């Protein structure tokens, strides 16, 4: 067995049996078949002269196939005087003990520890007296030698070290327990924080309230598997519909044309002064041509339709000149009555025929101006034919009358062409010309 292995075995054995290592010996090399009596007989011849001793225990060492004995010596025995080897049964028996130089190193470390703690050897002795009151009886007795005194001192120091070690361990255990409690508190606080985060807040309550208010809408969206449309898209759709309504409003407002009432009241005035009518029609047509929007074209059609209707509303409110001339000739009144009973499509058909035959302009212009104007022009021409020269005021008036139908010709032509096939079989223009010749 090696020396290091023997020393480790000595330390462990002393610690296990709670024996002071400074008074313990380890004897190795004892044969396995050697008994207790033979072991004591061999040790008695070597250790008896040095002082008292006793065999504490024996152990079998498997590696060496030998026995080892733990021996405790008395307090006055000097370990340095014990031989390290002596003869025995089966060979040489070896002795292992702690080296005194190791004790010196231990004392040095102990002095440093006492200086760091602010203690002295007197304090150590006082503590030993408190722990072991029996030692106070032998306090005044001088020790037999310095080795015994040193052993007592070392025993006291070892006890102090054990007490301090126990105190340090208790403090470490208390600190470890506090750290464990702190970790438990931190884990509990973390778990509580997670629970607080998982609890529903105001947003969940508002969402549940909205869902409770409109459950059908939510169910419908869930059944269709489509998310609800965003509010921005709905606002855009509403704005588009409003824009469409704004575009449609001018078209609807342009249909009820209010100005034709004034045109109806002054229809004969327009017939008498056709140049003014041509100027107004040109003034109306120029902004219509300048505008490019489709809604303005519809306004132009709306302007033309009431003009066509106004030509038929004229006979209901005849001017003063027409009433004065209607009283004198009888044929004129008959023609007025005939004109009053005629329907608007016939007059439009006459306008269409007049647009087709531009050669006899005088006959066509009389027919296209309505019943009242036709009678007035024909009666005046009958009175003034034999007397009036070519370059008189009548010729100017006829020229102005010729200009008026030309200004109104496109509007009436469009209306007559749309209803032209209905007016062809009637043949009203020829009758009118025959009647004028008879008169």
Swiss-Prot record:
Residues 231-249 have a biased composition (Basic residues). Residues 423-439 have a biased composition (Basic and acidic residues). It comes from the Eukaryota. Residues 213-439 are annotated as: Disordered. InterPro entries: PNM8A_C, PNMA, PNMA_N. Residues 403-419 have a biased composition (Polar residues). Pfam families: PNM8A, PNMA_N. PANTHER family: PARANEOPLASTIC ANTIGEN, PARANEOPLASTIC ANTIGEN-LIKE PROTEIN 8A. Belongs to the PNMA family. This is Paraneoplastic antigen-like protein 8A. It comes from Pongo abelii.
């Amino acid at each position: 067995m090696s020396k290091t292995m023997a020393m480790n075995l000595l330390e462990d054995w002393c610690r296990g049996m709670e024996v002071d290592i400074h008074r313990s010996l380890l004897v190795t090399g004892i044969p396995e078949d050697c008994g207790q009596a033979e072991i004591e007989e061999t040790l008695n011849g070597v250790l008896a002269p040095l002082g008292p001793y006793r065999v504490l225990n024996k152990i079998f060492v498997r590696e060496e196939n030998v026995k080892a004995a733990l021996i405790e010596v008395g307090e006055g025995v000097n370990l340095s005087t014990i031989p390290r080897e002596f003869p025995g049964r089966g060979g040489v028996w070896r002795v292992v003990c702690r080296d005194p130089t190791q004790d010196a190193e231990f004392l040095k470390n102990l002095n440093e520890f006492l200086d760091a703690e602010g203690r002295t050897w007197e304090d150590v002795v006082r503590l030993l007296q408190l722990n072991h009151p029996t030692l106070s009886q032998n306090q005044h007795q001088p020790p037999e030698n310095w080795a015994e005194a040193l052993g007592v001192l070392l025993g006291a120091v070892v006890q102090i070290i054990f007490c301090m070690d126990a105190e340090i361990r208790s403090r470490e255990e208390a600190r470890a327990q506090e750290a464990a409690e702190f970790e438990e508190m931190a884990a509990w606080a973390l778990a509580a924080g997670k629970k607080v985060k998982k609890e529903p807040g105001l947003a969940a309550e508002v969402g549940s309230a909205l869902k409770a208010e409109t459950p059908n809408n939510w169910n419908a969206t869930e059944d269709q598997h489509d998310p609800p449309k965003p509010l921005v898209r709905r606002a855009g759709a509403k704005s588009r519909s409003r824009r469409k309504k704004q575009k449609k409003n001018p078209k609807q407002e342009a249909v009820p044309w209010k100005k034709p009432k004034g045109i109806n009241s002054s229809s004969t005035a327009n017939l008498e002064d056709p140049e003014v009518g041509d100027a107004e029609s040109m003034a109306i047509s120029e902004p219509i041509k300048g505008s490019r929007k489709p809604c303005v074209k519809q306004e132009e059609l709306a302007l033309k339709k009431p003009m066509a209707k106004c030509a038929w509303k004229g006979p209901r409110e005849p001017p003063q000149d027409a009433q004065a001339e209607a009283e004198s000739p009888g044929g004129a009144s008959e023609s007025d009555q005939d004109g009053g009973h005629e329907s608007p499509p016939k007059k439009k058909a006459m306008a269409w025929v007049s647009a087709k035959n531009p050669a006899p302009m005088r006959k066509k212009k009389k027919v296209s101006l309505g019943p009242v104007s036709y009678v007035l022009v024909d009666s005046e021409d009958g009175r003034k034919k034999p007397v009036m020269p070519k370059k008189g005021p009548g010729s100017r008036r006829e020229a102005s009358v010729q200009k008026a139908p030309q200004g109104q010709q496109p509007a009436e032509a469009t209306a007559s062409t749309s209803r032209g096939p209905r007016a062809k079989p009637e043949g009203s223009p020829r009758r009118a010309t025959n009647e004028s010749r008879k008169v």
